[in-house]
C-alpha cells in the first residue's frame, strides 16, 4: 500500500521493477542499438527511427517541464521548471529557425534533421543528391568501388570516375561551401578515388534547376 503522502514503499518499488524489468531491458537495448548503429551512412532504417525519437524528445521534454511548473512541489522547483521550460522552448524555436533557413537554401527535407544542420549536395546524373553530414571538412573524399560511388561515407549510386561532378557543395543554415574536384585516380577498371577541396564559402542558395549545368549548382543570395 502507498503511504498517506502518496509515495510508494521500497517493497512496492521492488515489485514494480520485477514486473517491468523485461520491458526496461528491451527499451535500453533499443536505445543502445540506435546510439551504436543508427548512422545515415550505415543503416538508414535505424537512422530514421533515431530521428523520430529525437523529434519526439523536444515536445515531451517541454511538456515535462511545463507540468512540473504547474504541479510544482514548492516555489523553488516551480521556478526551476519554468526556467528550463523557457530554455527548451528557445532551443526548439532555434532548431526550427535554422531548419527553415536551411530548407530555403537547399529545398531538401533533410534540412529538418534534428541531429545536424550540415548537408552535402552532390549533382549526379541530373539530380542533386542531399545527405546529412556531422561536420564540414576542408577536404571531402570520394570512393568508387566496383562502380558504386561513396562520398563522405554515403552511398550515392553507380558512377564512373570520369563522370564525377566537378563541384559539390556543403550547406548550413548560414553558408554554402563550394568544393572543387581535385586529384582523382582510377584503380582496377571501375574503381577509384578522388578528393574535393573547399575553395569558396558564402551566403549562397542551392540551384535546384536540374536543367542547368551540373557544375553550376549554387546561386548567390541577394
Curated annotation (Swiss-Prot):
GO terms for biological process: symbiont-mediated suppression of host cytoplasmic pattern recognition receptor signaling pathway via inhibition of MAVS activity. InterPro entries: M_CoV, M_SARS-like-CoV. One of its GO terms (cellular component) is host cell Golgi membrane. Glycans are attached at residue 5. Its main location: virion. CDD domains: SARS-like-CoV_M (cd21569). Signal peptide: none annotated. Residues 2-16, 71-75 are virion surface. Glycosylated at N-terminus by host. Residues 37-44, 106-222 are intravirion. Pfam families: CoV_M. Belongs to the betacoronaviruses M protein family. Homomultimer. Interacts with envelope E protein in the budding compartment of the host cell, which is located between endoplasmic reticulum and the Golgi complex. Forms a complex with S proteins. Interacts with nucleocapsid N protein. This interaction probably participates in RNA packaging into the virus. Interacts with the accessory proteins 3a and 7a. This is Membrane protein.
